[in-house]
Amino acid sequence: MGRPRNDGGPTAPQRLEAAFFDLLSATPYQDVTISALVREAGVNRNSFYYHYTDLDDLARSATDNVVLSEIAHLIASGLTPASEQVDQLFRLPGMAERVRRMLILTGAHSTARLRGIVRETLQDIWLAEFGLEREDLEPQEEAALDFIAGGAMALLSRVDPNITGKEGPPELTLELIAEIRSIPVLTVGARFLADTLQEARARKRDE
């Protein structure tokens, strides 16, 4: 099969991911179909299957492109979720749309399957930041990773991604996320996870 053309506009994956979030904002994940996706994106089915094996594969790619791996790096360096440096990160161009898409992934139209994809992505980012694999963790460390990732997703799920809409003011979206970032339990949890993974990395180096 020949490679799909790119005439200088958004690539097929970019169009498919944009269509995915548009559909997911109005349709439960289990009701999103390949036919609806390719129609919304303006591509053909061959183009979809050139890039992805199925809807879950697209969801993983979309999640990878949305989750802010930079936050794990900043927190690992000793900062808190509410720090000025993290605030500056959220105010970079395009960040509000990434946040809006993240809220869609964890919102009312998500499912246990999709939340699992998001949770695994969050966990993989934290593990990669410390040079770890899941098998490097002790049971209590793995439990901490699961707990903090799940808690962060639970907090995000409380924010309605449609409160501003796709064309709404990004400042409101960022203000809502700033409120979440200032919650003390999130600060404590993020610091605890960073310390836990730091200990796991030190133990791995000593083995």
Regions found by a protein language model. Name each.
Residues 128-131, 161-207:
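C-terminal peripheral helix-coil segments that are non-catalytic and often amphipathic
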Residues 28-35, 55, 133-140, 193-194:
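Short glycine/proline-centered loop/turn elements that form peptide/ligand docking sites
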Residues 11-22, 40, 57-80, 117-121:
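Alpha-helical structural segments
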Residues 87-88, 108-135, 139-154, 171:
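Amphipathic alpha-helical packing segments from all-alpha helical-bundle domains
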Residues 73-107, 111:
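Hydrophobic alpha-helical connector segments
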Residues 23-57, 61:
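Helix-turn-helix
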Residues 1-7:
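Short Lys/Arg-rich basic patches
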